[in-house]
Amino acid sequence: MKGPKFCPTTRGNFVHKKADAKEFTRKLKLMEKFHDVQTNDTSLVKGKTFFQVNTENEELKDIVSKIERCDPISKDTQMNLTCGERKALDTLKNADDVVIKKADKGNVLVIMDREFYRQKLVLQDHLHTACYTKVDTDSDESVFEDLCTLLDKHSKCLTVKERTYISNSDWQTSNFYVLPKIHKSEAIKNAIAEQNSEYVTLSAPEDLKGRPIVAGPNCPTKRLSELLDKILKPLVPQLKSFVKDDWDVLSKLPQNCTDDCELLSCDVVSLYTSIPHELGLEALQYWISKHRNMIPSRFTNRFILEAAAFVLKNNNFHFDGDVWLQRVGTAMGTDFAPPYACLTMGYLEETKLKPKLLEFFTPTQCQFIIEHFFRYIDDGFSLWPKDLNLDHFMEVMNSLHPSIKFTFELGKKLTLHDGTEVTMLNFLDILIMLHTNGQLETDIYYKETNTHDYLPYNSHHPEHVKNNIPYTLAKKIIVFCSSRFVEMRLTELRTALLACGYPAHIINKGFHNARLQGPAPDPEKKKKTLPLVSTYNSNLDSKKVVSTSRDLLSNVKDEKLKRVFANQSPTLALKQPPNLLRQLTSAKFTSSPPCEPKESGLFKCNDNKCKLCRLFIQQCKSFTVADGTEWTIKSHITCQSKCVVYYLSCIFCNGKVTKTGKTNIFRKRMNNHISDCKSGDTSDKFDLHVHECMKKHNNFSKPYFKIYVYLEVSHPKFLIPYEDHLHTRNFDTISKRKV
């Protein structure tokens, strides 16, 4: 069975591989250009630039040329999905009566009836509660304007790069979706036990709840939230109850405790959507004042608080064509939400918990309670003395703030297979066992909904990634489990990995390295890596490009280049291709039928005020260039499009003088051409030519030139390989069919 992380084999994209190589050589030129430049840049966030840099170093020019001419090795990899499976995948992608989401916990996909998801999980359980309100219009444009005003107000707090990064974004409104919490549904647990199958079917479980997510990777406040996350995150480890992860829990858990203790866990009910803005900002004020020395001095308290308030109060999102606003709490999805929630809970523990505990317990008892309480965001764990009144503790916790409520669970007494009686309770992925003599043991914890469906070995992943999975999983077992449980869990893991297609020798090697606490260190890793970043594709292997780069850079003759690339080792850094989760799920939801694909060609926008479309753009589906070649446009392009390769033709010369170029935002570049043609204040030869023609013919009325487009790509870096073809117009390599 293929889980959500399974990657189908994809066909090789030669253009993308050449773009990756071009980006790598650009990195080499940047390293050479700025090697001796001293910088005191303290920016916590900054954007990536796409400008093309030139080098005067002849040896580097030769190296760049050889790397860019080195083609990836073409292979013919067998597809890892059958024809029937591919048809089924296409059917699921286009299904308009279901919604597919990843389960909140575990490697599981959940296929739900579309109306059940909309009415029950989203509207009834979330949007129709007091946390959210529907608004009439989309206010993101005014939010972005207010953001720029905020940045102007606190301009002294930000570097130029930070301010540019936050304010220069092509924002998009967020989308709302819900991840089903199948591990908390009794109906689903019962169905799993009854059906005992790789997949479980049941009808509309009423006890199914979900985790609300606001997906805003490009929302107006995203980059400001990213900066706040960098500022606040160092404060979180200062909290007394803080645990970083499972490994941290194990390091802080005592091996033994008194035999009169119980295991206790607690969980904050809907923490992210329960924190009132006033409480959260009060908590931030407390912590940034207490640990002022841990925050760069240029960030004033006022800026941090106003920026946090701005992110919290401008959380707009779309769902099913409507615009909503989250009124309470923070969006689970914005960058600074985890440290914000942690600091808020830490503030309540620091300022309210101990005084309230003293109403029921002695100072010594209070100290023990606080020292033996651990918390990971909204999950808490405690070793609780039996002689203390637990009801008083629960009363105290639920009185810390009217909006913050806890649920509690005590450990259950069970008998192990060897007859040993223990009290058991899980915290995160650890199962903690307390013996009657006070000894503590641990085991790895699997939820009842865990399918042990690990990444199939035939998934389209790099070999080293798949070969490392047995080691990683085995090491987790060896670290998490007390010695007497290790072999049993490793046997279970071996069975699961074999079922996923892993060769026995790969499993044995991984388990062996895990027992040794890791493979032998690789001396090559001592060198600084110089990554060539590329999406993995077994049909086009970029290892030859990397090995060529390594040979060229290790044998440079120029003294400056020797210093620049000293101890640098080019490596291949692989990105994951689209897996089933990415292909089958979407943050955007609409109950209306899917729109028909837009017609290919160059089209005018619907804005009557757009002079570019009204005077310059001619709608067309194909066009003829100066040499008589006709080109077909294969995507829907308007003045709003991005990452466009375009073609300009001077109207005064009947198309004899032309220009082919590339741009990120199409409208901005065209407006720049129009302005430069009119003024003549430019170094662009085409614009200067048009300007001279305008003077010669004494005609300054628009249009000055005709605009056509070749294609639109998904990312600015994919424009880079076309640079060599822009003036020759040899576009066969970019899959544009000549007509």
Regions found by a protein language model. Give the residues of each.
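Charged structural interfaces that engage phosphate-rich ligands
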Residues: 1-739
